[in-house]
């Protein structure tokens, strides 16, 4: 069945791709740009910024069927279906997609994008360019669509079911029916992030609209998923999947609470251990699990149906859990009890409102509870099979123009199986811990806890923690502060509120690091002829901005990086500053672990709590505990502490990151206009608050090399929610600079222009040291570089032969004092695009500051 419809789909996709071999990156076009007879432009895009690599399409299919191959339109490489972790050739999805069914007159119609047989594909996009997938990213501030971007990787696709041409939609030979459109349009938006807390899930947001002129009655929406989990090298991987539903788990982040998950999970049945040793092949084995989390459905209700089944050519093996009905159990086409093949059967399953038990429990006879008795091979099914499942929502009535929202998260989690665990310890053998954490973060990113998105005063559900050492418990809050329930009434010296659920209004926004500072560079050559680059920045916005989730200032520190190439993977940490604060570990007797329960404590807060001379450093592990007698309950409490980051908090050392104005107190006001008017001594000549002015001097640099320098900002994370510190990316704000005298110094001192290397030797092997360092794939002839330095910011360089012929003219035009404004290069190629020969050459540098003349030698 899979082979048949995949072959037809391959033909259709290749036909569309051949007709329109174009880039995916295009903005939305308001007026039609295609001809009526053009075919739909079927294409794909790859989510790969996080740890999941997953293919989405503009014809409704999520993933890539294992019987076919598709290729990334950007890279040309084979497209992954759902690899996790990416790069390890382990797949967790065959395909997924929407089912939409409705009653239209006397007909029951269902449109599907996946899970239909024999080459049927009923959703299609418009022709190119309207049908193309739009790409947006918060990483691209220069894109015209930056302001509307949601994540680091947004894909937007629009498709409809309006095409009824059987040559495109395919023909169902079993049911002998052609596609009959509902006339619906789906806008599919998918979002992914690369941050540590969000790189294990992808959000998919669907808007399903009735674009016909008729009402659609009793509409049901379903999400079909076929996982087929295993190594890509294993052609039989789809025969041993397991799946089930997980309602809730005990919270690991707020003691005493239960985390509501409501996920449908799927995994390989055993993680494919080595048959001899029983060990797993690390990330190259299917030891992870995946889940589908429903975040929003098209109604205020939160209920939905869950059905799973085995699809097989053998009708007797095609089976799924079914409830007994008064008129008997409905059998699907061919007497099947599993896979619904006709529109009527698909609609019946979506409307059944059944919620199946877990596949791993299929062997258990539930006939007394109203279910069909298990089949003869129930034990085999329980241990793994080719499973599909469907989540269904409805019914709804849709008038023309109405739209239904549906938002889901595809979540992955590691260590579902791991070495040292075995079937004898089932709960440890199949660990949901990673899925639990990643599901929570998907939920929080969708609807941010503590954020009043619609301005109605509701920020979601929360708990209040009492943080002072005399109290060690959680106060329960129900609905509003007026309904606070306390076990004991007392005053907390230090309190904190933790929101754990949003206000019900989608945000689609993740936690972000502090705003990165804008740096300015001031290069120079010192008296020892050593290059230096002074890096300056103002941290006002960085240090006063609040975190999206905690609504608190969570700035932790700065880091200085440098790179020779500018490559994202080539940046090296050279210096850092972070606040002096500590994580406090307390013992959880129920889990028998030491854990961090609160945000980091500053040294000032710790001394307020434990005495003005308190030093946490001697209490650094469970063998070196700090004992404190809590007089309120009359018992001893024990903690240990670890530095949160390095605690490099000395800002007076001029060899490290330091304050430009070390004696400047904290500002009297954070309003710049007010400060300039009433506190001018607190403001720099550039109009910035002096207190937040920093600098770092990079020393002993080679003036002949370019350096990429950057300053990042990072926060302290949220240890209680498993969120590690977030840091801005070094390469996103890097400045390319030479450790030479700046153009300002060159102009003020009328410095002599210098050319290097002089002489330039073709056999000098400069490429090994600095030539072509930024373009290593280019030929040597095109990466040669003769350097000019001590240039004014705006001038004209002309190169002449010894006979006075003009060889090359170079226009040098930079803003005054801009990075690199003192420097330029020539690739030894003439104005006629010819490589020059050996000889003596003259040059002139003309600017408003005068004209300089010099010469250099080229030796072949």
Language-model regions, residue ranges each:
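Positively charged n-region of N-terminal signal peptides that target proteins for export
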Residues: 1-5, 860
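Bacterial N-terminal signal peptides
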Residues: 6-16
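Extracellular/surface-associated beta-sandwich interaction domains
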Residues: 20-860
